[in-house]
Every structure is written in structure tokens, then in C-alpha cells.
């Protein structure tokens, strides 16, 4: 992905239990700035995690993100996850999916987002969830330009601040994980 997007790469991700958390942790470890879009306010989002330790780790990782937003609408699940997927589809220049290869199981799931990224022609690298083999679903075109070329992180964040009703910044409250 760095070869495709260059050193100015910024990750934009959800933070759902499972692969989203692994991706976010990898971004932190590799020092890739990440913008996180949550489907709900944190108090509600926490209920979607069966494992309290996984939720605590997700909160810590979100706390070091470049920025954290709540998707507009605060719909119920799975619609809220679909809103996050739509926002990611709208803004991502490329995707990295960890996917089991199964057909879509519902609104906002990985299978649905994989299909939509393919239909939109967004370069997408898929890592097989079982064997971890990686392949391009939609390979990048040579010389492809970014769909959204913001000259600086500040301009990107200003744009997102204007778009989202809620930006959640600041340190994690230790009392909540």
C-alpha cells in the first residue's frame, strides 16, 4: 500500500471487532497516521464487543489516532456499519481487506464493501482470512492519481471536521479502559 499511495499515506478505517482492530494496531506500530470513523458514540459502540479486552485495546488505539469521528445518524446496527462503509468507499484511494471470501452477509459487512469497491474500480488488496494469502481484486492503474488530493493533513482534517457532526479527540479516560 505504501508503494501505491506513497509516504503521505493516511489510513481511514472503522474500528469494528476483529480485523479492523488488527489493522488499526498495525497502523500504530508502523506509524501510519489513522483516522477512525466509529458507527456509534463510544458508549454504544462498546456493546458490540463481546471481549472486554478487545474493546479496551480498541479504545486505546482510537485514542492515538490522528482523528476520531462518529458517523452521522447514529443508526442502529447493522445500518450504522453500512454508513461507515459508505464513508470509507467515498474517501479511500485504495482498500486493504481481510476477508473470508464469503458472499455478503448483511448491510455494512466486509463482503458488501468488497463488492462495492470492485464495482467502483477502487484498487483493493484482499488478504484471505484463513490462509493470509494476499491478492489484488482490483489492481492499481499505473500513474493513478489520488481521488482526494489534500495538500496537507490539516486541510484534510478541516474538511472532515466540517463534514462530521462529532469529532472525538483527547486522551482516553483511564476509568473506561
Go through each PLM region and give its residues.
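Acidic/glycine-enriched connector segments
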Residues: 1-174
Amino acid at each position: 500500500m505504501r508503494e501505491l499511495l506513497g509516504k503521505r499515506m493516511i489510513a481511514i478505517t472503522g474500528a469494528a471487532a476483529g480485523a479492523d482492530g488488527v489493522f488499526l494496531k498495525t497502523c500504530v506500530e508502523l506509524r501510519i497516521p489513522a483516522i477512525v470513523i466509529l458507527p456509534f458514540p463510544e458508549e454504544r459502540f462498546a456493546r458490540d464487543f463481546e471481549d472486554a479486552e478487545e474493546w479496551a485495546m480498541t479504545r486505546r488505539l482510537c485514542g492515538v489516532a490522528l482523528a476520531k469521528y462518529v458517523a452521522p445518524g447514529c443508526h442502529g446496527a447493522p445500518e450504522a456499519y453500512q454508513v461507515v462503509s459508505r464513508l470509507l468507499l467515498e474517501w479511500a484511494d485504495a482498500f486493504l481487506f481481510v476477508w473470508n471470501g464469503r458472499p455478503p452477509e448483511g448491510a455494512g459487512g466486509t463482503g458488501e464493501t468488497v463488492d462495492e469497491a470492485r464495482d467502483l474500480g477502487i484498487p483493493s488488496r484482499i488478504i484471505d482470512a484463513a490462509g493470509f494469502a494476499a491478492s489484488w481484486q482490483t489492481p492499481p492503474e499505473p500513474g493513478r492519481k489520488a481521488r482526494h488530493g489534500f495538500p496537507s493533513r490539516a486541510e484534510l482534517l478541516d474538511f472532515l471536521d466540517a463534514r462530521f457532526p462529532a469529532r472525538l479527540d483527547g486522551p482516553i479516560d483511564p476509568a473506561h479502559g
